[in-house]
Amino acid sequence: MRKSWKTIAILTMIVFVTLCFGVLFVEAQTKIVRRAVDNFVFDNKNHYLPCEKLPTGAEVSRIVQEHRDIIKLIEQVNPGFVGVDIDTAICPGKADLLISYASHRDRVAIESIIGGNTFFGVPYRLQNR
């Protein structure tokens, strides 16, 4: 009887450890937990792209200048509380857009204006501040 309980305990631990590694692997690939926390807890949206996949700072600056009217429209969602910045701090030589806002209503309006997962090909992050 004792050996059977030990066997069950060992098998249970093996299954548990395997499941933990499986969950870690899935999270590393999809970032599903991080996305859920960002979205539902912090009301943020991130692109989770590695630096290699980001455009250069010059490309982002050019696209922002070409679409300055859309940037102004985004900033007018809630003047003084919505900002659009080119972020080059995280990845040297590369950039994305960081759009900050004050409420979920602002976020919904901003997403409606942008209408996709990129701003004319530039990845963006939405941060509720």
Write out the residue ranges for each language-model feature.
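Hydrophobic membrane-insertion alpha-helices, especially the h-region
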Residues: 8-27
